[in-house]
């Protein structure tokens, strides 16, 4: 089930305002250009910010998200008719044969179960064309980002279409590799809504192994330009079945 900040209509409507500027998306747009992708699958597209940016440039985009409330916000935006919107989770992606797939923000970290993560990776691979590229980010556990997720460091009042909203974050549990936290939203009418989340902080080597097991070739691991030293950006290529079989033979022969 998607977290309330995506699934509850009142929270989905203010999501973009709370998030503010998205410099992280500039990097994804540059990678789309780097690989010359003309079709993109946005997994966990949320309110469609990146999908709409790419579609405005003539790129064929499919935006997939499990939260209908977030997709409703995306569909209400100018240019939304250029994007194909699909309500689905990461393990049941449409077979669009995309040139490139992305998972921005914390999307890759919400799949906390190993089997679930493996299913998502296989689903992404199945949605890509042969040699298609997948790009996603994951936080570096050693940087302990959750230590900054507390009220005194995150509190702000944000102007939204719902009026001013008080916002802050509190961590509720740390049992690595899992971190749980709650985001608070206090509206001008006094309503206090909460969205509870759980993320898995996988180390880089564990992620790399999971990618190989799912049939990807690791092309690069980059520093996230908007959070240098704090996040890894993984760039991988979907292997053909013949390549996977060849790799399996090599492993057995070692």
Q: Model-found features: residue ranges?
A:
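A short acidic, Gly/Pro-enriched loop at the edge of an enzyme's catalytic core
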Residues: 93-100
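A conserved beta-strand element that flanks and buttresses the S-adenosyl-L-methionine
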Residues: 102-104
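C-terminal lobe and adjacent flexible extensions of AdoMet/dcAdoMet transferase-like proteins
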Residues: 202-254
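SAM-dependent methyltransferase
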Residues: 135-208
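A short glycine-rich, Lys/Arg-flanked "PGG" loop and its adjoining helix->strand segment in the class I
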Residues: 118-130
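Class I SAM-dependent methyltransferase SAM/SAH-binding core
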Residues: 48-92
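Conserved class I S-adenosyl-L-methionine
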Residues: 1-36, 38-44
């Amino acid at each position: 089930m998607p977290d309330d900040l995506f699934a509850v209509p009142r929270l989905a409507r203010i999501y973009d305002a709370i998030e503010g500027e998205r410099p992280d998306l500039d990097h994804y747009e540059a990678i789309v250009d780097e690989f010359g992708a003309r079709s993109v699958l946005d997994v966990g597209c949320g309110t469609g910010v990146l999908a709409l940016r790419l579609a405005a440039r003539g790129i064929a985009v499919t935006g997939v998200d499990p939260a209908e409330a977030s997709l409703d916000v995306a569909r209400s935006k100018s240019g939304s008719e250029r994007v194909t919107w699909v309500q689905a989770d990461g393990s049941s992606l449409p077979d669009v044969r995309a040139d490139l797939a992305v998972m921005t923000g914390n999307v890759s970290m919400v799949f906390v179960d190993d089997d679930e993560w493996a299913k998502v990776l296989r689903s992404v691979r199945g949605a890509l064309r042969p040699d298609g590229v997948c790009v996603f980010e994951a936080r570096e556990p050693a940087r302990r980002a959750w230590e900054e997720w507390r009220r005194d460091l995150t509190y702000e009042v944000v102007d939204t279409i719902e009026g001013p909203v008080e916002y802050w974050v509190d961590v509720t549990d740390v049992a690595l590799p899992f971190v749980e936290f709650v985001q608070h939203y206090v509206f001008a009418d006094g309503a206090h809504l909460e969205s509870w989340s759980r993320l898995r902080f996988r180390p880089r080597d564990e992620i790399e192994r999971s990618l190989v097991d799912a049939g990807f070739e690791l092309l690069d691991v980059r520093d996230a330009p908007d959070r240098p030293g704090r996040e890894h950006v993984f760039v991988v290529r979907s292997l053909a079945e013949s390549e996977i079989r060849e790799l399996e033979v090599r492993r057995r022969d070692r």
